[in-house]
Amino acid sequence: MTIEERHEIEIKYCELKWIINSLQTQLTQMERDKRNLEKAIAGAYFQDIKLALEQSYVKKCQEVDEVRQLKIDYTNKLLKIHDEYLKATED
């Protein structure tokens, strides 16, 4: 492996690491929002408000699942690149 190829893999690795960290930050905030919606639903007095909050909650849960899946996908890519790098440096 040339120095340029190794450098390219290191850049990809760093970019993926940054994406994963950003997704984790986003996921943490979304989980917090989800918990706040749960509390709002529990405290809602009027049925129409409760229904609207429940719809928001369902949407938020879907968004959380999507971001979580993205994080998994990027983590898998990161692991593949890490394995490639390790194999290349062993040669």
Please give the residue ranges for each predicted region.
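Functionally constrained cores in energy, signaling, and assembly domains
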Residues: T2, R6, K34, A44-F46, ...
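Amphipathic alpha-helical coiled-coil segments
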Residues: I20-L27, S56-E84
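Short, charge/polar-rich alpha-helical segments
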Residues: M1-E31
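Short acidic DE-rich linear segments
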Residues: I3, K80-D91
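Short E/K-rich amphipathic alpha-helical oligomerization segments
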Residues: T25-C61
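Compositionally biased non-globular segments, especially hydrophobic aliphatic-rich helices
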Residues: G43-Q47, L78, D91
